[in-house]
Amino acid sequence: MKGFTDLVDTLKLQLSGDDVPDVTQVNQGYGSLGQLVGAGLLTPLDDAATAQDWAGRQGESLLAVNGRFSPDGKTMGSGDLYAVADRGAWVGLFMNAAKAAELGIAGPPTTVDELVAQMETAKAGGVTPFMFGASDGGEQIWLMADLLMADTSPQVLTDVINGTSEQLPPEMLDVANTMQDWAEAGYFTEGWAALTSTDVLGMFAEGDGLFTLNGSWNVFQSDTPENFRLVPFPLGSASELAAIATGDLPWAVPSKAKNPDLAKKYIDFITGPEASSIWIKNGQVPASVSGNEAQEVEANGLVGVSADAILQWANLVTNGTTEPFPDWATPTWYDTIAKSSTALMAGEITPEQFVEALQADYGPFTAERKASS
C-alpha cells in the first residue's frame, strides 16, 4: 500500500510526463496541492473563474480554502486559483433529536457550555453523551479545531492552518485541557481509543448516544431520518458561523494539458447549476450554492441529516466562514495530532506536552516554508 507521500510523488511523475490528462483531482494543502503548484505542474484557473463568476457560486472563502496558492506553493489560501471542488464537505455535530427530546433537551446547543450541559444530562439519563472514536485520528482533529474556534475565533484557526505565525496560539492549551477533561468526565464512548469515527457513526445511526462529530460525506440512511440532525459545532455567537468546510477532491488543469480551455469548461459544468441539481437529487452536497437548495431538497424528499448536510452547507458558504482541515498546516500534522491527542485524552501526557508535540511539528515546518518563500 502506498503512503500519502508516495501518492503525491506518483501524481507529480504523471503530470510531468508526456501522457498528461486534461483534468485531474488533487488533494488540498501544503503536502499535495502546494507541491504540485510549486513544481509548476498546474495551470491557474483565474481567467475562467472570473469569466464564469465561480466566486458567485462558491464564495471567495471556499475558493481560497480549496485551491488558492502562491505560485511557489509556499503560501496557502491566497494567490492564484489552481483547483475547484464540485462537491462540498463539512464537519458538523450529529445529534439524535428524538433522544434529546426524551431527555428534555429542546434543541441543538448554541455554545460549548450548552453542549457540556446537554452531555451531562445525557450521562445522568444513562445515554452515552458523545459517540467518539479515535483510532483513525479524524474525530479528535476535528474536535480540536472546533474547540479552538469556539475559544477564540474562526480567524485564529485560519491563521494556524495558513501558518501566519510560527507559534501556535496560547489558547491551544485551553483546548487540550477541555479535550482531556471530557475524556475524564466519561462523555465519550466506552473503549473510544480502539474505535474509529466510522465505527461510532454506525453505532450512532443505530440509536446509540446523543452526539457524534463527523462529516457530511458520511450522511447515513435511517428508517427514522427525522430523528437525527446535523448542525455546525456550537461556537457561541450567531455572528461566528463557521465550520471545517472544504470540498471533495478539487479539480485542476495540468500545465501540460493538451486541451486546457476544454478542461476549464468541464470544471465550469461540473460546478455549475445543472450539475448541482444532480448532486442534490442523489443526496450529495454540491459545492456551489444557488439559493434554491431548500426547494430542491424538498422536491427530492430529503429529510433529517441528508437535508441538513445540504442546507447547512449552503448557509455556511453564503453567511459563514469555511475553514480548511487543520492537518493541512503541515504534511505530517495529521499523524502528530492523532497520536498526541489520543495520548492526551487517555491521560498519558499532559495538556502542556500535547501542545509541545504539536509545536515541535508545526514550528519548524512553518519556519522553513517562510524562509524558502
Enumerate the language-model features and the residues they cover.
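Conserved N-terminal structural module of periplasmic/extracytoplasmic solute-binding proteins
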Residues: M1-A39, A51, G107, S237-S239, ...
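Short helix-initiation/N-cap motifs at beta->coil->alpha
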Residues: K2-T10, V112-V116, G191-A205
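Hinge/lid segment of periplasmic solute-binding proteins
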Residues: G31-W90
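Short, solvent-exposed loop/beta-turn-alpha elements that line the ligand-binding surface or hinge
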Residues: D46-S61, A134, D151-D174, L235-I244, ...
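Extracytoplasmic/periplasmic solute-binding protein
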Residues: D72-D86, V91, V116-T164, V200, ...
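Glycine-centered hinge/linker elements that transmit conformational signals in sensory
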Residues: M119-T121, I161-W192, T224
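C-terminal capping/gating helix-and-loop segments adjacent to ligand/active sites or protein-protein/ligand interfaces
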Residues: V160-I161, A307-Y362
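Extracytoplasmic/periplasmic substrate-recognition and gating elements
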Residues: A185, D223-P286, K339, I349
